[in-house]
């Protein structure tokens, strides 16, 4: 079960630093400064190793859709196998080695799956829209996340799904919720607030995806 770690040992020098970077991202560090602090290396070192991981397709760099790369850039694990492994396996290696993982799974893994599955579910929702692109009210150019600052309420916001048009200013704004609770009208109202902060469209079409359904 140690294939990801063994792969790094075979392919890369100093695998410990690569392991530390991947583990930091898997545990939620997405900005360069956060990754640097978790890894304990200088900016130049982390940046160099990140470039290699990006070239290998293990890590990807993302910027809010419709914006140029800059301070808002974040780093995510592009390979979901690596993402799952580094999120759950090292922390539970003792249980795996001793054959206790079936007993520890409910609280060591299962209770955290909704949080882990969030990004996976978002990708599924993006793929769904692309698959049914001919039926959408907007001719899509690209789909991605958007995040930024709501200056009126002094808060950071994130829109799970933004469909940018090939031309014009009609946008799709979406929410993707992988939770056990049903979603109500308050989620639509929140999306409308977020769309006004996004502010790049003249018309918005709202799509809400929910694992548990709707109230």
How would you name each of these model-derived features?
Residues 1-82, 87:
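Interdomain hinge/linker elements that couple catalytic modules in large macromolecular machines
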Residues 73-215:
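A cross-kingdom feature that marks ATP-driven nucleic-acid transaction machinery
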């Amino acid at each position: 079960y140690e294939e990801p770690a063994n792969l790094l040992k075979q392919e890369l020098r100093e695998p410990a630093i690569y392991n530390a970077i991947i583990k930091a991202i898997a545990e939620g560090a997405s900005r360069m400064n956060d990754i640097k602090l978790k890894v304990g290396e200088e900016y130049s070192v982390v940046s160099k190793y990140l470039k290699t991981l990006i070239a290998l397709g293990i890590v990807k760099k993302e910027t809010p859709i419709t914006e140029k790369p800059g301070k808002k850039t974040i780093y995510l694990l592009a390979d979901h196998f690596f993402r799952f492994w580094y999120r759950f396996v090292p922390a539970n290696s003792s249980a795996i080695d001793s054959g206790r993982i079936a007993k520890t799974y409910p609280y060591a893994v299962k209770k955290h799956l909704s949080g882990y599955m969030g990004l996976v579910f978002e990708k599924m929702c993006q793929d769904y829209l692309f698959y049914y692109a001919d039926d959408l009210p907007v001719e899509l150019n690209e789909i991605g996340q958007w995040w930024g600052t709501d200056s009126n309420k002094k808060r950071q916001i994130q829109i799970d799904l933004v469909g940018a048009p090939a031309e014009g200013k009609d946008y799709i704004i979406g929410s993707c919720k992988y939770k056990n609770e049903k979603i109500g009208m308050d989620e639509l109202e929140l999306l409308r607030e977020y769309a006004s902060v996004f502010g790049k469209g003249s018309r918005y079409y709202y799509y809400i995806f929910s694992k548990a359904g709707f109230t």
